[in-house]
């Protein structure tokens, strides 16, 4: 596997750990409010949903780390989880914020392209 692809995949996994922390633990704190442009009231009303979404982001990170841990045998695992991240990013960009296209979908697409070209 390409070192560049694995570095990008690791960065995508780290991003999703960061999303997990923001959504599960910091959603209604100053860092979470700033990151998502939320008011305290809106954050309080959506806290449970955000925590659930954060958990899913943790599963994406875990899948990518699992794929990396398998070395060359993890190719299909990495492809699967990168495609999941890409689809989630495209959906988020279409329904929530265009910024998600660049923060989530683009890194996954770059990782997927590097992986397939390796």
Describe every region a protein language model picked out.
Residues 64-90, 94-106:
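Transmembrane helix-loop-helix
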Residues 107-118:
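Small-residue-rich segments of transmembrane alpha-helices in multi-pass membrane proteins
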Residues 24-32, 72-73, 97, 101, ...:
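Transmembrane helix-loop junctions in multipass membrane proteins, especially transporters and channels
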Residues 43-59:
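Interfacial helix-start motif at the membrane-water boundary
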Residues 2-26:
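N-terminal signal-anchor transmembrane alpha helix
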